[in-house]
Amino acid sequence: MVLIHDAERALDVLIHQPAVDSKRITMIGHSEGTIIAPRVAIDNSTKVKNIIFIGIVAQNLRDILHYQVVYRPAGNATQALDKNHTGLISIQQIAKDPHRYSVLLRFLLPSSVVHTFLRTNNTKVIANFLLNKFANNTIEAGYISIDKQLKPLLIKRYENITAFNLLKCNNLGGCPIWYRSVDTLIPTLSIIGNVSKSTGILILNGENDTQTPVQQAFLLQQRLTDVKHPDHTLITYPNLGHVFYPSSQWETRNGPIQQNVLADLYSWLEAHSGLSHPFVTATTSAIRVKTS
């Protein structure tokens, strides 16, 4: 994978900088970077002192995509939007408040409809598209059936994505060639035992992370325990999302990393890298699981 080679080249350049202490190198990976960081550390065990995983991808890409594309939006529909537990969602309600239904609309609307709505702020374009798309609902007109219509649509979307069609690349945030390159990698969960026992490991994850769910962090923590890695710490943060900003369990909001996360990060680095200017104090509000 090209990004792994790029990271290794960057590490080599960094080590040779006069301002860098080559004996205290820490690899930090966020999201996709958590796939890259341990591989670089394994291949450069004498150079990397610590690894920090932020928003961890522990399993393979298909597991993560299934959570993002099927499990999360279907769960959002069933648990948050279907208030009357009828198994149906009103199309008029969706069109009336598209921001509330934004998690679903990402999967239901083509980009042309989204662009028209953003340009005109006319919710009728949303209602008309959905009414036409789901006109075959024989249970109740004007509604989307979660089990018979929404879930099959999400599964089909997942199957299309995981086909990794190399001929199509319609956006920057996940071209098929990138998906396929990541999909061929052995999951981090299966290689983490190859990290040197002398390498310190910190795992940080928001409990409301909708991109890399917190269960991924628990899986990695358990695996590190199983292989008897002597120095690993897991800290999870209630109500924080993928970028460690307050978020709901269904959608990550963007914003600055919260100060308690930065404080915990610095405190751990101070203890593991000998930082000499402790200008922050670690908080105790996060849920912690530590092994030493």
Walk through the language-model features, giving the residues of each.
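Alpha/beta-hydrolase active-site loop
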Residues: 1-16
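Primarily recognizes the serine-hydrolase "nucleophile elbow" in alpha/beta-hydrolase
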Residues: 13-73
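Accessory cap/linker subdomain of secreted extracellular hydrolases
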Residues: 54-194
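Short, proline-enriched alpha-helix->beta-strand connector loops that line the catalytic pocket
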Residues: 194-201, 230
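Short beta-strand/loop motif that positions the catalytic acidic residue
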Residues: 203-205, 209
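Conserved alpha/beta-hydrolase "acid-adjacent" motif
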Residues: 210-216
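Catalytic histidine neighborhood in serine/cysteine hydrolases
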Residues: 225-246
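Catalytic active-site module of serine/aspartate enzymes centered on a nucleophile-bearing elbow/loop
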Residues: 240-243, 248-292
